[in-house]
């Protein structure tokens, strides 16, 4: 054996496997994301918290991941990518629970099968007997991906599996989450469970699960001073010119709202470019200590991805409905869907003050 052969063997030995980093693997292999607002394949720079969530979930030390995320922040994409990576690199039986069977079947046919078919490392291992119209996905080695209703007792009790994914837990009946977690008892040391949803009510099963985790919050790095900080609604600032005798001019609020850096006070412009810069070096920071080993929580609110001015108008409309008619539905929607926080019947007080001289920010 000559020197060149020895060097080739050495390089092969030292080269990390293709699947060493799940984010890099997804970027290489998921070349198209069917039914996605984004064109092309998976790009980690678009929503950086998705890549961070993938690495955290697929880390061997993570047993349970709870993701209370705002709507339109990549929750479903994260689940699709995680399932695709597992079926290519660490196959095992999986159950994906939705609030009802119709939504479960839709998830398989609309979101899961299409992305599986994009990736040869998954597609090529499907069974020849797999039915492309079925909400059950069969692999040649006997692995099965089920999609079931969390509202049906038999679907929560009849399957033993290694992986459990749960979506839209705010719609699940009481105790369904615990039943789904019990499906992995036979695989306790190699199992993983991922639960993703907008929050529901304080004290419901999903909220209690999140409270058991280390409650990591998505933090951004301010481009003005480099300070790492969480997206906090109290640092939203309305322009003084938007104030009127009766309240706020919604159009001026939408056009002129900014975000104040928690450290240096710089007003960050409400643009996608600003948010991209902020998120580029962001990370999840633990806000507590998990009550069980391997229990991780990841929280993302809409400030990370959505126009601050647009969100501010939504908040003002919700406050006006609450103040004028006692209608709390808008506040509940804003808090659970956009701030990704659980709702309680008392609701708290919604305060608006968003100028440099006024009290800090807006609290729903």
Locate predicted features:
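Phosphate/NTP-binding elements of NTP-utilizing enzymes
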Residues: 1-364
